[in-house]
Amino acid sequence: CAWPPGSAAPPPAAAETGVQVIAKDCFVTEDSIAIADEVPVVLTNPQLYEAPELLVEWYRERKRDLPWRHHVNAYRVWVSEIMLQQTRVEAVKPFFERFMTELPTVKDLAEAPEDKLLKLWEGLGYYNRVRNMQKAAQKIEEEYAGKFPENYEEIKALPGIGNYTAGAISSFAYGIPKPAVDGNVLRVVSRLLASDEDIMKASVRTKIENAIEPVIPEDAASD
């Protein structure tokens, strides 16, 4: 919404000092603000601006050697993130390596016979995950000429991909600073914000995503 002439505009350094206000669908006059829709307000703890540098340093010194962190591309990140849903890292490793050997590209996944696909997934469970992956791969082949999209919204529009996976692909594969918010991130950030809101609510997740996206270092988004 626009601030009328002569009225006090919000200070440009507000976000840096710990306040980020996000409003939508509102009308501002000299004497009042009329709100026509829900207004999410995020009070950003200054610690959120200090944490990324420390976390990046810690990660670079202690990161685990995982197969999907080698030869990084959007396809490999995507496959690993879908496999890691509801499944332990150690359990995923052999499945990931076998899957990459048998279906190394989006095209291979799009064209794989269903029996082969399900056999490769056998032991991971939740078979709809891999069925959605094939639908997404087919969409990439048809609409993007086989090239994995780089735009966050286009990635999120693929079957079986939500905010977290789209954020992970954007960050890890393309270096685009987008949040990948899972349960661990929700718990840590809610404590930094001194929030007692229910982190299981979609509105709270959105609030936390809005809070951390501006503080993701552009030069370390893939970390």
Give residue ranges: language-model regions.
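Catalytic cores of DNA base-excision repair glycosylases
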Residues: I35-Y49, E53-D223
